[in-house]
Curated annotation (Swiss-Prot):
This is Homeobox protein Hox-A1a. It comes from Takifugu rubripes. Residues 285-300 have a biased composition (Basic and acidic residues). It is found in: Nucleus. It comes from the Eukaryota. Belongs to the Antp homeobox family. Labial subfamily. GO terms for cellular component: nucleus. Sequence-specific transcription factor which is part of a developmental regulatory system that provides cells with specific positional identities on the anterior-posterior axis. The gene is hoxa1a.
Length: 325
């Protein structure tokens, strides 16, 4: 990735070396020599390569800042032993070079860089980190020194909420009924319906009155009178006669049919209990008539006087007519 790095190196003896490092991945690279004014270091040693920005952006020099990118370099072989590997911290800026960069793109922390002579483009590694709100060209990178033992808070506060407003509203809508039901049970109108206990069948005069949900037909006095009159003449009705009675009494066929069934059962039960006299059948009447005839004939034979028969009278008269000689 095209980038521009500008480092400011602080040495221990007051001597300074201004170092500018650029990636050499794209385009033509222009190298500039960096003279190091240290005791035993020669001027021909080049520590880092620089690359000029094609857009003509002026190079900016940054002061050393603590809690920034930590870099460590080893001492050159020509330098004296007093210049041991030292670490320095600095900040850097990013400039796009001949390549489009995504808006608000961030980069992760850079690792410590070790170098002893020349720096190649593969030393500095940069990776994408996330999305921010800083405009292009003014991206500032905050880095924590390695080995510091603490984490630096993330500068991206816009991504702290992992749920979008739509998902958050949906989550609240789903969780709110559960919390309400857990706290207090809600009573609905359909739960307040009064449920009457089922009515038990009451034993009447002629047994149970049927199921409690059966609608009982209340007959008027006129209807009962006409039904009793018809029952007196006909215990069983034909369908045509049932239709006529139902139409005359403003009833339906089923009501008339059921009334006659119940009336027949009541009649049989009363006859069994002896409350009503039993009507004579044809066989009984025949036997009774035969008995009456026999009784009448016996009475006539007993009451009639005894008269002599004509034969006996002729015999007696003939005997009297013949005299004895």
């Amino acid at each position: 990735m095209s980038s521009f790095l500008d480092y400011s190196v602080m040495s221990g003896e007051g001597s300074s070396c201004s170092v500018r490092a650029f990636h050499s991945d794209h385009g033509i690279t222009t190298f500039q020599s960096c003279a190091v004014s240290v005791n035993n270091c020669g001027t021909d040693d080049r520590f880092m390569a620089s690359r000029a920005s094609p857009d003509g952006i002026p190079h900016q020099s940054y002061q050393a800042a603590v809690s920034s990118l930590g870099l460590a370099y080893g001492a050159h072989s020509a330098c004296s032993s007093s210049y041991a590997p030292q670490s320095f911290c600095t900040t850097y800026n990013h400039y796009p070079l001949n390549q489009e960069v995504e808006p608000a793109a961030g980069f992760p922390q850079c690792g410590p860089l070790m170098y002893s002579g020349n720096i190649s483009s593969s030393v500095v590694s940069q990776h994408r980190q996330g999305y921010g709100t800083t405009p292009l060209g003014q991206l500032q990178y905050t880095h924590s020194a390695y080995g510091a033992g603490h984490e630096q808070p993330s500068p991206f506060t816009g991504c702290s909420n992992p749920l979008s407003p739509l998902h958050a509203a949906h989550l609240e809508a789903c969780c709110s009924p559960l919390s309400e039901s857990a706290s207090s049970a809600q009573t609905f109108d359909w739960m307040k319906v009064k449920r009457n206990p089922p009515k038990t069948g009451r034993s009447g005069e002629y047994g149970y009155g049927g199921q409690p949900n059966t609608v009982r037909t209340n007959f008027t006095t006129k209807q009962l009178t006409e039904l009793e009159k018809e029952f007196h003449f006909n215990k069983y009705l034909t369908r045509a006669r049932r239709v006529e009675i139902a139409a005359a009494l403003q009833l339906n066929e089923t009501q008339v049919k059921i009334w006659f069934q119940n009336r027949r059962m009541k009649q049989k039960k009363r006859e069994k209990e002896g409350l009503l006299p039993t009507k004579p059948t044809s066989s009984d009447s025949g036997e009774r008539n035969q008995e009456k005839v026999e009784d009448g004939e016996s009475e006539k034979s007993v009451s009639a006087p005894s008269t002599p028969s004509p034969t006996s009278s002729t015999v007696s008269s003939g005997a009297d007519s013949y005299p004895s000689n």
